[in-house]
């Protein structure tokens, strides 16, 4: 989108926003976002991670544990695997003469599922299952309906008079008995058929 100024015949190009890189403090080129939410130019963050890796390598050459580079803003871990590229319209192609590699493709998630985790080697697998939150809510509703938790049952009847409150509580009690009967009938049908 081009915006023309009538006074001095200059053209301003709107590239989709005035977002600044947190390193060079200029408008972002080849923008990438860290998982902590900070926006950087790809060449700037690449130079930052490369420079911090080299300086850390020189200082810790005898120390075998290597820490990943840190975000310049909040000091959380940053690597090429944790950078998410932002694509927009009208972006220029990267210059072929620069020594900065192309932007990363973004984080890759393991599609094996939440319930699996790999240990040290491929042969060690630990399986764990997380309970389904929907099932927990359903179980809690059935429990409250069947066994009538008194603390939760009194809240809806606070603003009623005594007679209508008693009728509503009796209706709810008979409804819970009907639910209990239907639940028992359903289990009996499952076991018998």
Curated annotation (Swiss-Prot):
This is E3 ubiquitin-protein ligase RMA2. The chain crosses the membrane at residues 175-192. One of its GO terms (biological process) is ubiquitin-dependent protein catabolic process. Interacts with ERABP1. A zinc finger (RING-type) spans 21-75. It is an enzyme of class 2 (transferase). GO terms for molecular function: ubiquitin protein ligase activity; ubiquitin-protein transferase activity; zinc ion binding. Barely detected in roots and limited to the root tips. Expressed in leaf hydathodes and in siliques. Pathway: Protein modification; protein ubiquitination. Its EC number is 2.3.2.27. The keyword Metal-binding applies. It is a single-pass type IV membrane protein. It comes from Arabidopsis thaliana (Mouse-ear cress). InterPro entries: RNF5/RNF185-like, Znf-RING_euk, Znf_RING, Znf_RING/FYVE/PHD, Znf_RING_CS. Its main location: endoplasmic reticulum. Pfam families: zf-RING_UBOX (PF13445). The keyword Phosphoprotein does not apply. E3 ubiquitin-protein ligase that promotes the ubiquitination and proteasomal degradation of the auxin-binding protein ERABP1. The RING-type zinc finger domain is required for E3 ligase activity. Keywords: Endoplasmic reticulum, Membrane, Metal-binding, Transferase, Transmembrane, Transmembrane helix, Ubl conjugation pathway, Zinc, Zinc-finger.
């Amino acid at each position: 989108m081009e915006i023309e100024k009538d006074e001095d015949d200059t053209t301003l190009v709107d590239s989709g926003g005035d977002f600044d890189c947190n390193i060079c403090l200029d408008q972002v080129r080849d923008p990438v976002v860290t998982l902590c939410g900070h926006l950087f130019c790809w060449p700037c963050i690449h130079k930052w991670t490369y420079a911090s890796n080299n300086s850390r390598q020189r200082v810790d050459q005898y120390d075998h544990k290597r820490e990943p580079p840190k975000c310049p803003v909040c000091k959380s871990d940053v690597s090429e695997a944790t950078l998410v590229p932002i694509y927009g319209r009208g972006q220029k192609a990267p210059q072929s003469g620069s020594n900065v590699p192309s932007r990363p493709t973004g984080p890759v998630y393991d599609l094996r599922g939440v319930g699996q985790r790999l240990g040290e080697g491929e042969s060690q697998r630990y399986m764990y299952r997380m309970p389904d939150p929907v099932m927990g809510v359903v179980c809690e509703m059935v429990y409250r309906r069947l066994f009538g938790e008194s603390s939760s049952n009194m809240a809806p009847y606070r603003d009623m008079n005594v007679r209508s409150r008693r009728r509503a509580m009796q209706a709810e009690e008979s409804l819970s008995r009907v639910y209990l009967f239907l639940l028992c009938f359903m289990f009996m049908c499952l076991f018998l058929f």
